[in-house]
């Protein structure tokens, strides 16, 4: 049983998936595609919650992050406040990188890719 923890995905596996969803959420929001932005954020939150369950040492901070700035982004999407959405994204990235620092992973500095994801039509509604 003690070896099962090593078989479960850790944050090093989960967070790149979160980053991909956040990337898609951001560019969907820039395209004012509420449905796609909302879906991508929901999927990112699901992955973050899974990470918090699988790695309980992160659960309190993950809950705070999801309930705080991520919740603000969700509100911006729901109300189609795209200006607030962009501003909240800047804050979210800063906060995410601050958590990396907190957990001695300051070398992990996430940034939004300069280009939208090529695998989705962000304008489709």
Which residues make up each language-model segment?
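C-terminal-biased regions
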Residues: 1-125
């Amino acid at each position: 049983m003690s070896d099962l923890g090593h078989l479960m995905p850790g944050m090093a596996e989960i967070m790149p998936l979160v980053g991909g969803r956040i990337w898609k959420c951001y560019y969907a929001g820039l395209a004012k595609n509420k449905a796609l932005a909302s879906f991508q954020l929901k999927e990112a939150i699901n992955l973050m919650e899974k990470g918090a369950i699988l790695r309980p040492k992160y659960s309190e901070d993950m809950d705070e992050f999801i309930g705080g700035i991520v919740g603000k982004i969700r509100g911006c999407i729901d109300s189609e406040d795209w200006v607030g959405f962009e501003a909240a994204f800047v804050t979210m990235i800063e906060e995410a990188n601050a958590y990396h620092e907190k957990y001695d992973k300051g070398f992990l500095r996430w940034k939004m890719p300069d280009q939208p994801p090529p695998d989705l039509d962000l304008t489709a509604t």
